[in-house]
Amino acid sequence: MKNLNQVVDALKQGNVIAYPTEGVFGVGCDPDNEQALLNLLDVKKRPKEKGLILIAASIEQLLPYIDLEQLTEEQVNTIKASWPGPVTWIVPVKTSTLPLVTGQFDSIAVRVTAHPQVKAICNAFGKPITSTSANLSGLEPCRSVTEVEAQLGDTGVVIFQGEVGNRTQPTEIRDAKTGNTLRQG
């Protein structure tokens, strides 16, 4: 288990980290490091077509990855009103975003977190990190450091000591263009 500085150093070195979120532990990496993204997909046994979520401390951290010009002012205001919080939005993506982040899609899933430890990681790292649940494919997501160690301990994942929030449901996922809810939260 590592402290904040060690976790940020691990991100800068291209490592995959495990960290607490609003409801479960997540695993993530630097969204601009292709090898780190490949390592993350390997740890999760996740198909690259599925894409990943970016989680950030602020909307400003997401601006290099998202194309808000394709959205109306009302759509952008709706997104901003839901953050920080447990709502993930599917938004248009900038072409400079690595395909391993977007998967088979021409959009990207993004969230501004309210979890203080994730905010601290993103602020110290200076940008968003990828986020997907910390578990091996087919197993339940981890809710404690002990569970992360049991499932992912031999994968080289750097674990950030912390507590998950009290959410029992996954985050809600909504489409920014249509407003449709794709997953209830």
From Swiss-Prot:
Keywords: ATP-binding, Cytoplasm, Nucleotide-binding, Nucleotidyltransferase, Transferase, tRNA processing. One of its GO terms (cellular component) is cytoplasm. One of its GO terms (molecular function) is ATP binding. It catalyses: L-threonine + hydrogencarbonate + ATP = L-threonylcarbamoyladenylate + diphosphate + H2O. PROSITE patterns: YRDC (PS51163). Its main location: cytoplasm. Pfam families: Sua5_yciO_yrdC. InterPro entries: DHBP_synth_RibB-like_a/b_dom, Sua5-like_dom, TC-AMP_synthase, TC-AMP_synthase_SUA5. It is found in: Cytoplasm. GO terms for biological process: regulation of translational fidelity; tRNA threonylcarbamoyladenosine modification. Disulfide bonds: none annotated. Its EC number is 2.7.7.87. Residues 1-185 form the YrdC-like domain. It is an enzyme of class 2 (transferase). PANTHER family: SUA5, THREONYLCARBAMOYL-AMP SYNTHASE. Required for the formation of a threonylcarbamoyl group on adenosine at position 37 (t(6)A37) in tRNAs that read codons beginning with adenine. Catalyzes the conversion of L-threonine, HCO(3)(-)/CO(2) and ATP to give threonylcarbamoyl-AMP (TC-AMP) as the acyladenylate intermediate, with the release of diphosphate. Belongs to the SUA5 family. TsaC subfamily. This is Threonylcarbamoyl-AMP synthase. It comes from Aliivibrio fischeri (strain ATCC 700601 / ES114) (Vibrio fischeri). The lineage of its organism: Bacteria, Pseudomonadati, Pseudomonadota, Gammaproteobacteria, Vibrionales. The gene is tsaC.
